[in-house]
Amino acid sequence: MTPLRELYDLYYYPNPAKEERRRQLLAEIPTDARDEENYGRTSLHIAAEFADCEAIASQLDRGAEVNDRDEEGHTPLFRLASRRSRVPALEEPIASAARLLLERGANLPRSARGTTALLEAVQNRHHAMAAVLIDSGQRLDSANSYGDNALHILCRRAADTAREIAGKERFIASFGERWVSEKQQREAREELEELQAEQMRCYATAALLLHSGQIAPDEKNSAGRRA
């Protein structure tokens, strides 16, 4: 196992007993070393993917290139945005990591090939990170290979959430017609509350995008569809 693969595994399978080893690897692995088994990613890509602000700062202080690309053309900022997690408690650390990368020179429009970290953040519902990116002063109107800008993607996400809300409301309405355990009822209501909160986050992000003045609400994508 290469040191970079070991580092990735220590992040993916966190173990307090191996915390010292993780820190040792971060201090010893050359900042330009690449994991050929993981798309040529560096230790900075890995630290960003797991929103580890301390490690991000240490790698940059050691000379890591903030806009270094892996074999897929992804920069550390994009790897951060690509993290798939719907755990609310992780959203602020992700946003803080994005802010740190931007402060150290991360380029938003050129954060990936055929897409950007903003598009990816919106796709993965990282609204706090999206707010940081929107506030960065960098270009926001980039589109992906389908011509979709951040508003197109956000509106699709909002529509997905609306469908999930409708389905959950139908399920809750059926409680009076069939037996459903108290645990299932409680979980369904909690899930509905979270979906409704997500819907409001979509609206707030849309407002930020429109207020930026960089994205027109009637702009069409490659298929001729508006947001």
Regions found by a protein language model. Give the residues of each.
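N-terminal segments that cap or nucleate solenoid repeat domains
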Residues: 1-59, 64-68
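Ankyrin-repeat boundary/"N-cap" motif
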Residues: 2-11, 34-43, 69-86, 110-117, ...
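Ankyrin repeat A-helix N-terminal signature
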Residues: 10-17, 46-52, 79-94, 120-126, ...
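Ankyrin repeat domain, specifically the short helix-to-loop turn at the C-terminus of the second helix
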Residues: 24-32, 57-65, 97-107, 131-139, ...
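Alpha-solenoid repeat scaffolds
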Residues: 32, 66, 83, 87, ...
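Internal, charge-rich low-complexity segments
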Residues: 146-176
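Charged, low-complexity interaction regions
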Residues: 177-181
